[in-house]
């Protein structure tokens, strides 16, 4: 895809120039933030006592990003993703991930996501069911990018890569 080609062409240069490792999470996070502007029902939080009795629609995107640690999965929150560039998002995810692995996240850094992304693809996952992280109202599960055979002009070719996304 265009994203994979862009990353392959630029990741080494950007790492050298900025110190930021270009992955896929920054681009997917930015794409989600742009889509959430147009789909307010997916960018909401469920609030109230018990199971929640109020849906609050947000005009900002505070994105929860699942991070695996020795103690389990945590979801630190990148605030105001809609106002960030892809490299800024990558940097924020990296910094929060390091804090998570060092058990140094504050409660504020782990609460208030309006939408969450879980990337099981880093573990080779081909499919799965992401678990909604309240108070957010939606989650995106990303999975491994794999080469797949495609029939092109009657011949089987392995020239396309695909991933499964679910919510």
Task: List where the protein language model places each region.
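C-terminal catalytic/motor cores of large multi-domain enzyme assemblies
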Residues: 1-167
